[in-house]
Each structure stands twice: as C-alpha cells, then as structure tokens.
C-alpha cells in the first residue's frame, strides 16, 4: 500500500509519500502504479525546487529514498498561491491514481490554520 499525506499547518506544507505498490499482478498494475507515484513525486520536488531557486521559499527540505519521499516547504508571502497550486495539481494526480487503483494507494491529509 502506498500512502500519500499532504498537510498544511500555518502555511507550512508537508508532503509524505511512503510504501510500495503491492498487488497480485506486480508485473502490470504494480509497476504502472509505482511509476506513476514516482513521477508525480519527482515532478513535485522539481517544481518546488524551481520555486526555491526563484526565491519563493523561506524553507525547503526533501528526503527521497526507496519507498519514501518527504517534502517540507514554507513559501514567502508572495509565492503562497503558486506553491499551493503546484501541490494541488500533484494531489489531483494522486487522487486519480487512488480511484484507478483502489486499495493500493491512499491519499489523505489536512489543512490547519491555512491562510489564503
């Protein structure tokens, strides 16, 4: 099971992706899901790095290893909506995968004290 958690607490985004695609047909659906989860994670990290290079983040950290990705990002005031838009697009991708591969991926999270 792959777990995707996306949270926003007081304007600081936390994204955690963990696990592997487990299913009875690993040579087909498992590989497709795994590749899809990975490319969304890599895309997320790169688009946030691009925002960081443009001076749009107060803080950014990432961990990427086998079976786990963790990203923490705190935007500058002027880039809050840009960061949120990038994360929402990636979240939509994960939600589509959750519908396509029920029981193999779970997407969750919460937003606390979010300012827009």
Identify the role of each PLM range.
Residues 1-32, 46-116:
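N-terminal intrinsically disordered, cationic/polar leader segments
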Residues 33-39:
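Gly/Ser/Thr-rich active-site loops/lids in small-molecule metabolic enzymes
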Residues 39, 43-47:
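Alpha-helical support elements that line or immediately flank enzyme active sites
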